[in-house]
Amino acid sequence: MALLKGKQDQIIIPLAAELDADHGKLLTVRCEATIKRLPYDEAQDVFRAIQNRADNSGEPSDETLVSRYVLGWKMPGPDGTDVPFSDEALQEALQERGYRDALIEGVMTMLLGKKVMERLRQKN
């Protein structure tokens, strides 16, 4: 049991996967991911490893980060019902750029915090 109010081992982060659609349009799929929440020091270590990927043979890769920290999701399938979370479904999502980008952004939001991610978006 946590001593501090609001402390959680995992958090649900809303995502928006932007998928290429016909006629040059984008289809935005709203979904959410349950992400493992790390203690501050551990999150900083992971972020430093990401910054030093060139020195670490590309590790941790995006696939490693998503596989390690995404614990579940609420993701709509083609018929609108939720796709059950599984390793197979996760690997399929990682092969689609829009879902991949959304899941990576979710992991980065957990590592850096929502406010920092918002500031980074404003700069870009």
Report residues per predicted region.
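Short, hydrophobic/proline-enriched secondary-structure or compact coil segments at domain edges
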Residues: 8-18, 66-74
